[in-house]
Amino acid sequence: MTLGRPSRVRAKRHAQCLAVLVLCLGIAGDVAAADLGLITAGEHGTYYHFGQDLRRLLTSQGINLIVYPSNGAVDNVRALVDRPGIQLGIVQSDVLTAMTDQQRNLAVRAAAEGMPLVFPLYDEQVHIVARAGINDVGALKGRLVAIGREGSGTYLTALALFQLAGVAPAAMITMDGAQALAHLRAGRIDAMVSVAAHPVRLLRDAVKLDDGLAFVPVTAPAILDAYAATEIPAGTYPWQPNAVPTVAVTALLVAHDAGRHHCATIGRFAQIVVEGLPWLVKNGHPYWKRVDLQRPVKGWEQYDCVRQYASTSDRHWEAQGRAAVKPER
């Protein structure tokens, strides 16, 4: 059957409306693509505060960063894999390695192995606090040790350290830092592990000199082969007279962008962070002063979408001056 003129006009108008609708949907899709999700940590933690600082910086540049709290490192990796609205996460540099060794879920394991680096953030030191007389990691054999909440970065790092050192505590107890310190001061456990940038507020404010507690040096050769050696400087805590050798991990901002659907937005995100670092140092959490975005991280490859966009900010970076963002010593 041949269409009459009115029918042809209606069909043409219908096609035009459909084209406009498709265009509008395309625009809406572009707007949605400017949304990014970032999984961090508990709402009182440094990771979450870093996320909020980034959100404030990015809002003025047209990127809506949605910052999510979490229960810890394992939760972060699972969220990156399983939750489509989350493309970015903050984890410790050894956490993904630990997860690939321990994670039974093959999909999560495969994704963890392939997560690329966006930027390094700052170092976090291993703090092992124990009752007097426990002078090295080996002395924790047969002892009761608190290792953080299950699934947290502290938890996974503690498991890795004891495995590397060949030390088997009588029990590794999962509890948060405040609970662990209360148990340690009461003599119900022998030691606690905390992995965080010094000074850790809890250890600075709640431990007293007459508690009879001290840091345990972390010097086992097998641990030093796998982790970066560092120290907690003398006087970092009021009850700590001498420097203590230990090891550190690095807090990392990582991505999970299956299908590379957010390549351009993550790249633009990276460019804004590079150019906005002086603002973050001035207006954000004090630990932004410790951040060096160009620092290489052993075993990690930066996302090529980040390299592509952030490299266009090199001149801006040099104009700002590296001294302004040199990590504290």
Regions found by a protein language model. Give the residues of each.
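Pocket-flanking alpha-helical
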Residues: Y68-R109, Q179-H183, P199-V207
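An extracytoplasmic/periplasmic, membrane-proximal ligand-sensing/linker region
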Residues: M175, Q179-A186, A196-L209, F215, ...
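Bacterial N-terminal signal peptides that target proteins for export
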Residues: T2-L18
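Pocket-lining segment of extracytoplasmic ligand-binding domains
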Residues: S93, R104, V167-H262
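Bilobed "Venus flytrap"/periplasmic-binding protein-like clamshell domains
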Residues: D35-L58, E124-A186
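Bacterial N-terminal signal peptides
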Residues: C17-G26
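Ligand-binding clefts/hinges and TM-proximal coupling segments of bilobed small-molecule sensing domains
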Residues: E150-A160, A228-K298
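A structural signal for short loop-to-beta-strand junctions that line the ligand-binding cleft
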Residues: A107-L121, T236-V244
